[in-house]
Amino acid sequence: MAQKLYAGAKLRELRVKLGLTQKVFAERLGASLPYLNQMENNHRPVSATVVLALAQEFGVDVTKLTTSEAERIVTDMREALADPVFTDSPPLADLRLVASNAPAFARAFLDLHRAYRQTHERLASLDEALGRDEADLRPSPWEEVRDFFHYCDNYLDAVDRAAEHYAAPGGVRRDVFSAAMETLTRAGLDLQISDMPAIRSREGNALRLSARAAAPTQRFQLLHQVALLTQNDLLEATLDLARFQTAEAREIAKIGLANYFAGAALLPYRPFLQAAAETRHDLERLADLFGASIEQVAHRLSTLQRPGAKGVPFFFVRVDQAGTITKRHSATRFQFARFGGACPLWNVHRAFETPGRFLRQLAQTPDGVRYLLLARDVSKPGGSFTAPVRRYAIGLGCEVQHADALVYADGLDLKGSFEPIGISCRICDRQECHQRSVPPLEKRLRVDPDRRGLLPYEIVD
């Protein structure tokens, strides 16, 4: 049965933006006034007739009415409310109600909790902020940019289509390296491959790329420069819509947008989507076909969410050797902890032990959703004996209902047992987890001095 669509907040926001009364809005939607009122308050789902009217009458992208954003807000609120500062956590139904009916309030709450957490961390570490007259309680520029990409599903339609038009006009791929060289020539820039530690450097009329960087990295950096040269107006317009609070966040986001363009040009949407389906998402074959790295391919797969031409919904993550998440994107219901690392039961942590191999895992999260997870180590050599080697592990996953579209599902028992994993120990209520680091803050604990199990306490429902 199709899931009912509740989008009251978005209906109300659209009506207010258009300056229409409920009566006029209802008439243009072909709905009665009481029914519109019920839909705006999420007492009734949005009917198919209303969805069609929104598209035809107001040009609304109906894919924006889905609840994926609300689900991410609920996940973030659950994690925030697991903080010890809160005695009790509201029921999940209440959180879903807030996320659906008052998303702006929910985001304000998350901003407030983030400000509190930053203040608490400053006090705990006695850092330099204690000496300031005013502590900056706003999110850090990096966090602000991270949340921007997080809440747009890591898919930016205008930038993605511009990159596809550049790399595959008319849907036919062209040699992006040659195209990029033509762009540089028209801009009066000369490309130089130099032996230098910096990956990319522009000095005057010379664009220098490091000879120590791998070929996919060089191509990516070249296309990054193309984005800055040819898409500046588009990037600036996108930044204007984002309304970042600081100049630093805007500058970081512009780099992120140029990187997005580079990845989308290296792996243009329609040709890459078709190749992914034909190869059954074989990352190594896709990397060879497009001259990209495995990490670039995995990252791109997580962005294939164009309305009307969506790919398999993946999540993508990259962790360092300490387990810290350094990249995270999700087009699935799977969400990552905003603070700390990933669940230690996840196979991404074991990828460092098996270099050069893909690890497969069938896993189930506490909400009952089952996933096929892939993990592999990736190394980024420094290009010389004395240069440090950066080592990471990447994880890619999709819900098991899409597993047949992946070559990595072959030979796995998709109806068999699934390993339990979570998001963060603080919001995971699994009782028999041998890797738990802290107790779940939404549960009561029982401590028996005469008995010791896996944990020094018992989790009580």
From Swiss-Prot:
Q: Name one Pfam family in it.
A: Peptidase_M78
Naturally occurring in which organism (per UniProt): Cereibacter sphaeroides (strain ATCC 17023 / DSM 158 / JCM 6121 / CCUG 31486 / LMG 2827 / NBRC 12203 / NCIMB 8253 / ATH 2.4.1.)
Tell me the DNA-binding residue spans: 22-41
Q: Cross-referenced Gene3D superfamilies, in alphabetical order?
A: lambda repressor-like DNA-binding domains (1.10.260.40)
Name the domain of life this protein comes from. Answer: Bacteria
**What happens without the gene?**
Mutant is unable to grow with propionate-HCO(3)(-) as the carbon source. However, the mutant can grow normally with succinate or acetate as the carbon source.
The Swiss-Prot or TrEMBL record annotates one GO molecular function as: DNA-binding transcription factor activity
Its biological purpose is as follows: Transcriptional regulator that controls propionyl-CoA assimilation through the methylmalonyl-CoA pathway via regulation of pccB expression.
As recorded in Swiss-Prot or TrEMBL, the protein's gene is named pccR
Hey, which family's this protein in?
Answer: Belongs to the short-chain fatty acyl-CoA assimilation regulator (ScfR) family.
- Tell me which InterPro entries the record gives: Bact_TransReg_Diox, Cro/C1-type_HTH, HTH_RamB, IrrE_HExxH, Lambda_DNA-bd_dom_sf, ScfR_C
Question: Which is one Gene Ontology cellular component term of this protein?
Answer: cytosol
State the UniProt keywords alphabetically.
DNA-binding, Transcription, Transcription regulation
Q: Any idea what this protein is called?
A: Propionyl-CoA carboxylase regulator
Q: Where is the HTH cro/C1-type domain?
A: 11-65
